[in-house]
From Swiss-Prot:
List of residues binding [4Fe-4S] cluster 1: 68, 73, 79, 308
Required cofactor names: [4Fe-4S] cluster
Reactions it catalyzes: [[Fe-S] cluster scaffold protein carrying a second [4Fe-4S](2+) cluster] + N(6)-octanoyl-L-lysyl-[protein] + 2 oxidized [2Fe-2S]-[ferredoxin] + 2 S-adenosyl-L-methionine + 4 H(+) = [[Fe-S] cluster scaffold protein] + N(6)-[(R)-dihydrolipoyl]-L-lysyl-[protein] + 4 Fe(3+) + 2 hydrogen sulfide + 2 5'-deoxyadenosine + 2 L-methionine + 2 reduced [2Fe-2S]-[ferredoxin]
Name of the protein described by the UniProt record: Lipoyl synthase
Cofactor binding mode and count: Binds 2 [4Fe-4S] clusters per subunit. One cluster is coordinated with 3 cysteines and an exchangeable S-adenosyl-L-methionine.
Keywords, sorted A to Z: 4Fe-4S, Cytoplasm, Iron, Iron-sulfur, Metal-binding, S-adenosyl-L-methionine, Transferase
InterPro entries named in the record: Aldolase_TIM, Elp3/MiaA/NifB-like_rSAM, LIAS_N, Lipoyl_synth, rSAM
Residues in Radical SAM core domain copies: 80-297
Pathway(s) served: Protein modification; protein lipoylation via endogenous pathway; protein N(6)-(lipoyl)lysine from octanoyl-[acyl-carrier-protein]: step 2/2
GO cellular component: cytoplasm
């Protein structure tokens, strides 16, 4: 019997090293042929990289992280070039090891106490009007990092009184009530938590997470803050059926969620879960119609849509594909 790997604190485990640490073996035993990307999945990069370099420089200066970089988002160039970014707080090492995600796994270090102030100043320097704050999972913290979210919201608003804040939170597994209490006095303008996939695929896609728990988190926040919109995102192309996605949409509506993102899953590397199917744009269009019929007030559905992709436009109800 092999000995468990002893992880060093602060060390990032990625790709094959990260996958080897997953207790539930989700990866196929036989090598599957990698699907070729269809034409609609090809990205046109911006001609100028000046704004991209400016944003990266501002983050490096204050030792901040963006999920855009840490998760290898395909929209990084477009979003950075438009002066938008999703900040990732509480470090860049996640205590979970989901096989779809490119964020590093490991034993994270203690959260930086000055991060909320640094984040607020960086946002002011960047002259942002809408900001998305997300984090890694921090199962090592008593409140899952919720107080840190609240501190960031407070500091950001003090320096940027006109700003709108969207938080994309983890599931706060085992500490939901404590987390919601911590965030109660400084809630965001939009509360986002992703279901990611259909419940049948949770063991494969989100080991350690629970579908109903995530739904309950969205519902409980909404009950405490009825005027704050709740939002969730789902990936497609992991082996789900269209019918399963429709059922997920119904579950979200039944738990008070009014904002939705649906996008195509892209494997960050050959070590991650493979893409089972590239969903055609027409199918995303069909699901958007269904979502609006179910009562979602905002539904961004398309191959390149991500939770925070043009989140400011999503919040305004503008078309995002």
């Amino acid at each position: 019997m092999s000995k468990p790997i002893q992880m060093e604190k602060g060390v990032k485990y990625r790709d094959a090293d990260k996958m080897a640490l997953i207790p539930v073996k989700n990866m196929p035993t036989e090598k599957k042929e990698v699907l070729r990307k269809p034409e609609w999945m090809k990205i046109k990069l911006p001609s100028s990289s000046k704004r991209i370099d400016e944003i990266k420089s501002a983050m490096r200066k204050n030792n901040l992280h963006s999920v855009c970089e840490e998760a290898s988002c395909p929209n990084l160039a477009e979003c950075f070039n438009h002066g938008t970014a999703t900040f990732m707080i509480l470090g860049a090492i996640c205590t979970r090891r989901c096989p779809f995600c490119d964020v590093a796994h490991g034993r994270p270090v203690t959260p930086e106490a000055e991060e909320p102030k640094k984040l607020a100043k960086t946002i002011k320097d960047m002259k942002l009007k809408y900001v998305v704050i997300t984090s890694v999972d921090r199962d090592d913290l008593r409140d899952g990092g919720a107080q840190h979210f609240a501190d960031c919201n407070r500091e950001i608003r003090e320096l940027n009184p006109e700003i709108r804040i969207e938080t994309l939170v983890p599931d706060f597994r085992g500490r939901m009530d404590r987390a919601l209490d911590a965030m109660h006095s400084n809630p965001p303008d939009v509360f986002n938590h992703n279901l990611e996939t259909a419940p049948r695929l949770y063991r494969k896609v989100r080991p350690g997470a629970n579908y109903q728990w995530s739904l309950d988190l969205l519902k409980k926040f909404k009950e405490q803050h009825p005027t704050v919109p709740t939002k969730s995102g789902v990936m497609m192309g992991l082996g789900e059926t269209k019918e399963e996605i429709v059922e997920v949409l119904k579950d979200l509506r039944a738990h008070g969620v009014t904002m939705l993102t649906l996008g195509q899953y892209l494997a960050p590397s050959r070590h991650h879960l493979p893409v089972e199917r590239y969903v055609p744009p027409a199918e995303f269009d069909e699901l958007k119609v269904i979502a609006l019929e179910l009562g979602f007030t905002h539904a961004a559905c398309g191959p390149f849509v991500r939770s925070s992709y043009h989140a400011d436009l999503q919040a305004k109800g503008e078309e995002v594909k």
